[in-house]
Amino acid sequence: MRFILSGCLFLLALSLPAQPELAAWILNTDGEAGQFWNGNNLVQMQEECDVQLVQFSDDFVYVHSNGIPRYPTAPFPDGNPSQATAQDYLFQIPRNPEEGPSGGTATGLGHTGVLINGVVIFNAQDAFSYNNQGVWHQNGGFFENGGFDCAKGHPAMGQYHHHQVPTAFDDSFAPTSDVCDDFPSEALFTLDMAEHSPLIGYAFDGYPIYGPYGFANADGSGGIARMETGWQLRDIVVRQTLPDGTALAPNQYGPDVGALVTPPIPPGAAPVAAVLGAYIEDHEFVTGSGSLDEFNGRFAVTPEYPEGTYAYYATVDEDHNGQYPYFFPAYRGVVETDNFGGGPGPGGGGGTNVTIDEAVETWTGSVSGVSQTLNQPADFYAYPNPVRDVVRFAGILPERVEVYDAMGRCVASWSATAMGQGLSLTGWPAGTYCCKDLTTGQHTMLILHP
């Protein structure tokens, strides 16, 4: 059945099951393109941003995207000459993830998951190691930090990606870069210590990825807490052993902690101090030292999964700067390996090997066979949607909206500031709500509250 909304006087309050693996994606419904900083000017790109198309079957979600964010990218202060370019991605996300082999499957170079805006994430490595020996691998969060734009992203041969939580540098109590001062970007989301962080993406094993704040207790109780990783810095001053205790031959030693090393890129880079944490092998997992397991995740209740799900968390330190392993060092679940391109996997090159060889439907906002048509497309969007707890908005936010329930009653009035920060729907009756843009008088968006 299909309901046509006129004004916002629709008559049925629909109690709809959440399908976050479908509804979480930020679809490009306005044809907007990406943009980047060139000097002091924002330049409009030709390629569309966000996700272009979402298709699904009973077992998989297929996500089509260019890998271009809506938020501004560039410049890259390390001199990276590349810009974000369209990648024509097709990703395949399992809808019913299964636990993988004991110990998980290590992530490799290249993309390891995809954010809800179609931009990919990488693991902590930057593809280089000390003396090119493949023993002491560089931590991209340290060596590449000076080359990230305000949103903490950068391109590798046009493939724009994030190695760590996709928030802006200045969304921190002690920013590790000042690039946002002159070249601001809102990034994917902002941190809120009082709210559960949003669902920000999916790994290629099908498990969701959240920002760094979750419920203090896995059952959803105890308020909100920062998820603390169990990966800790080792207590070493020389790099002569690996985290598992392996004693290295002298020709495999890394630089002493704090010694000066010259990064391999950019050409002519000045030496930097190889502080503890500069290399992946400076870290070890200490059971019980944090709230997350060795995959940087846990099984817990989340707003989108009220019955609980295994989920990864993009971890930050107490200053809200990215903290190793940033996303996840290995997959807990069975990995859909067609998501990796031509390079070694998991990880691979820039593309994917995904093809659709089954019957699929196109996601248009339908839930359980019910779809809605509005009389005006929205220039802004809500996420997550469906939403159980806190709803946030992005895009071109109106100065104020009124929210109507299924009986046509105005139940709330929200400002642009409040919409950007997030609004709690806790205690609201389940149903479908409509936003009316008071500037244009148009009813532009549905919020599904199961």
State the predicted function of each range.
Residues 207, 212, 221-344, 365:
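Extended, compositionally biased non-globular segments
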Residues 19-149:
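Solvent-exposed N-terminal domain segments of exported/luminal and surface proteins
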Residues 106-207, 212-215:
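Extracellular-facing segments of soluble proteins and assemblies that are Gly/Ser/Thr-biased and enriched
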Residues 371-383, 387-450:
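C-terminal outer-membrane/trafficking sorting elements
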Residues 1-4, 450:
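Positively charged n-region of N-terminal signal peptides that target proteins for export
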Residues 13-17:
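N-terminal signal peptide c-region/cleavage motif recognized by signal peptidases
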Residues 158, 308, 429-432:
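A glycine-anchored, Pro-Gly-centered beta-turn/N-cap motif
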